[in-house]
Amino acid sequence: AVWRWLYEHPEASAAELRSAVTRIAQEVWNKHYAPIFGKKDVIAEIEGWYSCTSDTPDFWRRDGEPYPMHGGRFTGDPAYFKHVRKAAKKLMERLDLRVSDVNYFVAHQPNVQFPMRIAKELGFKEEQYLPSLQVAKFGNTYSGSSPVGLAAVLDIAKPEERILIVSYGSGAGSDAYSLVATSQILEKRKRQKLTLKYQAENPFLEYVDYTTYRRLKNGM
């Protein structure tokens, strides 16, 4: 959606682009990626979780500034990789899991490089992490990026398959969850027509419409 907006608005300013990306992320998440947690009739059960945080200001907004800024390379090793790595490893240790015990690995995906690098570093193979890698299709949806990856995996996961998902938030921290698909996932999947694959490949599905464009032109 972001690339399409850029194609349709080649003369857009940097400020308009930032606003458009924020609006796209909000609309994608609000319309299609609101997960529901419950105690019964679930398609996947939470096996365990682990959280870690630190005072690592890799992304911030100065007082009076309308948009945040990030710390360049500082957002990599001391921020994203350190926290995602720790959360994933600690949860696997807590649950006594090996890499081979995980069917799908889902990481926060601000770009293509970061989740691929951490997946390989942790020892996961392509068939374990590529199904969740959706950032090239949807762009950076920020806090929605790991749920988008999870949605892609849930569209293909089989009963008893394990999913390791690790989110990341600037500031900084990560939450890791181990999910195990239940037998209900196959039946409930039949009711789902708006799959992630459909949304990514449907040329008629627009997230940025005329109303959004008018809001951009009018300064939101």
Model-predicted segments: where are they?
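Short glycine/threonine-rich loop-to-helix capping motif typified by GTGT followed
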Residues: 109-125, 177-178
